[in-house]
Amino acid sequence: MTVKTRFAPSPTGYLHVGGARTALYSWLFAKNQGGEFVLRIEDTDLERNSQEAVDAIIEGMHWMGMEWDEGPYYQSKRFDRYNEVVDQLLAEDKAYKCYASKELLDEIRAEQEANKEMARYDANHPKIVAANAAAKEGDACVIRFRNPKEGSVVFDDQIRGRIEISNSQLDDLIIRRTDGAPTYNFVVVVDDWDMGITQVIRGEDHINNTPRQINIYEALGAPVPMFAHCAMILGDDGAKLSKRHGAVSVMQYRDEGYLPNALNNYLVRLGWSHGDQEIFSQEEMINLFSLSAVSKSASAFNTDKLLWLNNHYIKSSEPEYVAKYLQWHLDQKEISLDNGPAITEVIKLVGERCNTLIELADQSRYFYQDFEEFEAGAAKKHLRGVAKGPLELALAKVEALEEWTTENLHNVIEEVCAELEIGMGKIGMPLRVAVTGGGQSPSVDAVMQLVGKERVVARIKMALAFIAEREANA
């Protein structure tokens, strides 16, 4: 039997961190088992759904690299199938029409609470029996599933172990509303049955739904999938993860400069572990992932840890991979790569210093765009009269260079130091400010090599003009 998992988000918002981790676990399990992964959009709530949310979910899945084998399927296009199964259950007396109004049910619930009874639907309540008896053909009604009254529902959760719920705790679930819309707990059963889903991996907030769904599977004679319920993700303060803890949408992490491999690595470790290993390639995640290694306990989201992972992936990934995701940020900042070095060379040089792709884009700018002024603090400290002689000598030497290599540029700096009998900082820092516009960069000889001879010469001249003006105004 082919293992088949699914991710089934509701398009009422963006793909959030909790949903992304659930999708990742489902995707990894399917890949680990040589199975298939299905994407299904649960869009039966027509009032709250939006195409924008659907697009955001699909964009987030693509960005994270979780491609699906089937789908996306849309529940809103399957109403005929749901009605067909409702009719089957009605014909087999496994479902029935209920004419009790919402007002009547609210009244009964208030009485139960006043009498300190468990508030629940009871088909045999005299007022409900009377409402059904008084109904006429064509009156508004819901369809309820006839839940077993005896026994228990038992299932082996692949994360939490054996779970047992008495049927006496479950009431007769509405499977179709008065407006004809099918309900969540019903349609997911029909979908998972039709789509051959073998493992349902989802959040622990669905545990209470599982026994209700299992009873529907059994009433339909459908195979019951295995279930695995993941613990929730908390903020680093122990509260439920929310916007105040930082980004909660997957695409917000894209916007903030994270690599998908870093986010995937971080999310997989929010609940799953393999010894003390922290860094996992996608191939390792697929090969090592198992539900038995997923913790029952909630995990705390730590942005500092994610930032550390992002820096690791920026500096250790192939430059071509980083460049693929950096391009979006370069576009946002209107940095064109048409006039400058290969971006992969810039990534090799600058990437190690950057925690995010936003930082990397910012630190790439001076390789491709000229600046009109120097950073004030750096210029005040390093572009002074004392730097004039070293910069003039360096300018003459770089203009005379026939081979523009990092080694030759390093030799130029050493020659300036030797001829003027100055320390490296007396020329290195003024050159850095002149060439980059600021006081921080990788090794200045390597930076100069990538910036290119024409720009380096022009920028040293600009720095000398700045010093001359500063002296004139002193």
From Swiss-Prot:
A motif ('HIGH' region) lies at residues 9-19. It catalyses: tRNA(Glu) + L-glutamate + ATP = L-glutamyl-tRNA(Glu) + AMP + diphosphate. InterPro entries: aa-tRNA-synth_I_cd-bd, aa-tRNA-synth_I_codon-bd_sub2, aa-tRNA-synth_I_CS, aa_tRNA-synth_I_cd-bd_sf, Glu-tRNA-ligase_bac/mito, Glu/Gln-tRNA-synth, Glu/Gln-tRNA-synth_Ib_cat-dom, GluQ/Sye. The keyword Aminoacyl-tRNA synthetase applies. It is found in: Cytoplasm. A motif ('KMSKS' region) lies at residues 240-244. Its EC number is 6.1.1.17. One of its GO terms (cellular component) is cytosol. GO terms for molecular function: ATP binding; glutamate-tRNA ligase activity; tRNA binding; zinc ion binding. ATP binds at residue 243. It is an enzyme of class 6 (ligase). GO terms for biological process: glutamyl-tRNA aminoacylation. Catalyzes the attachment of glutamate to tRNA(Glu) in a two-step reaction: glutamate is first activated by ATP to form Glu-AMP and then transferred to the acceptor end of tRNA(Glu). Belongs to the class-I aminoacyl-tRNA synthetase family. Glutamate--tRNA ligase type 1 subfamily. Monomer. This is Glutamate--tRNA ligase.
